[in-house]
Regions:
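Interhelical loop and helix-boundary elements at the membrane-water interface
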Residues: 1-168
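Alpha-helical transmembrane segments and their cytosolic interface
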Residues: 170-172
């Protein structure tokens, strides 16, 4: 708790948290089932990676021996501050994104042409960028607007992850 590792509510996660982190991924995989467009797999991977990278980056980043910096102005802030980032945390985001991309590739995600290192790169990019958007929103809107809570931040993080993954997928 002292390092900010424990979640609010004693670590319990409610349905709003699950919705905020998972609804975009669920929508992408359902849409893929019906339409079969490979870019929906990229969106799914980016969305899922964004939620996972955000959590891993935040939790692992809090273990850093150096103070994190606020994403908006790069000033040192205490661990656990909304919008704080660290090299350790950002490195964890890249590593987790790569792991998720590798798992998707080796598990044989259902695609004809989208696989291999492209799949890994799209997953890493979506996860990293989505988590970065989460940090920015945490430092700005989440801390200044009562109506804009963590679940909204998570929801927009996963949308950003999906969008950034689609953009890279389209460019490859």
């Amino acid at each position: 708790k002292k390092r900010g590792l424990a979640e609010k509510k004693g670590g319990a996660r409610g349905y709003k948290n699950v919705f905020g982190n998972g609804i975009v991924s669920l929508a992408m995989i359902i849409l893929f089932h019906y339409f079969g467009c490979e870019w929906l797999i990229a969106a799914y991977l980016g969305s899922a990676a964004a939620a996972t990278c955000d959590t891993a980056g935040g939790e692992i980043g809090r273990l850093s021996r150096s103070d994190p910096r606020l994403i908006t102005n790069l000033k040192k802030v205490p661990a656990g501050t909304e919008g704080a980032v660290s090299s350790l945390g950002k490195g964890a985001e890249i590593a987790i994104g790569a792991l998720l991309g590798l798992i998707a590739w080796f598990a044989g995600m259902p695609t004809e042409t989208f696989a291999g290192m492209e799949m890994v790169a799209v997953t890493v990019f979506g996860g990293f960028m989505g988590a970065t958007v989460d940090s920015f929103l945490g430092a700005t809107l989440e801390t200044t607007q009562n109506w804009f809570g963590n679940n909204m931040t998570n929801f927009l993080c996963t949308i950003a992850g999906a969008v950034f993954s689609i953009l890279l997928y389209s460019a490859l």
